[in-house]
Amino acid sequence: MKPLIPKKKHGPEHEIQEDIIKFLRYRGWFVKPTHGNMYQSGFPDLFTTHYTYGHRWVEVKDPNRTGDPFTHAQREIFPLLCANGSGVWVMVGATEKEYEKLFKKYNWWQYTGVNR
């Protein structure tokens, strides 16, 4: 009989998120993860702010995931955040290339498959 292997508590997106949090904090950002509970449905994964660069909402995505990366609530909330001056940036890893995205126009819509 094979021993029971417990399921991981968190998936690959959580590991990416933890790496991004460390990466941003090392660069002087304050990072506050959202909890993803029913009261925060549709909000991005991280609220970040920096003394020099201001605030960013960051949504963490697994680059290997297939299918629609956004929930219905995110598809409702993200455009409203952006329309009201709070962009949403998608990051798929803790790299310099991903970090550079935070200094360009918000990019969440690029992950929807819809051209703007």
Cite the ranges covered by each PLM segment.
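Catalytic phosphate/metal-binding cores of nucleic-acid and nucleotide-processing enzymes, i.e., regions
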Residues: 1-116
